[in-house]
Amino acid sequence: MIEKIDFLLIGCLVLSLVSMGGLTSIAPISFRTQIAEAQQISGDITAPSGGNPFGGEKMGTISVDSDGNETKIVADLNESPGEGKAFEGWLVDAGGSGYKLSLGQFSNGTLNFTQNMINPYTYKNFEVTEEPDNDLDPNAASSIAGFELDIPFGQ
């Protein structure tokens, strides 16, 4: 009998809180979903300058579109790689871990990259390296061009 009374008291308490608006601020929290606002960035890919992998002479263009989940990058370079070389694009966690994520090789001067990314905002730069064809070394060579991503990119 006491259990039924406790149940009724709790039910009445919840009902009165809801009717007075006491739980209205709590209810949306449990149903809230995180939706990132789509972010589009475009600009010039430039040669290194002043110790940065960007800021010098224009070498191409980049367009970045991210909604915090799917990230699309299209980069075009005006230059051609040297004989036996290929350009490779990277997202770089500059100022943090320094980790470089390879986005793949440019083909005919263009890099197209699309991926569902968990934390794209950890990356601060897009950088380009010139690598040997069929390079077996997974590490990035020195950057020959770059673009600083707007912060907070991908959030």
Indicate where each model-derived feature is located.
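N-terminal targeting/export leaders
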Residues: I2-C12, S19-Q155
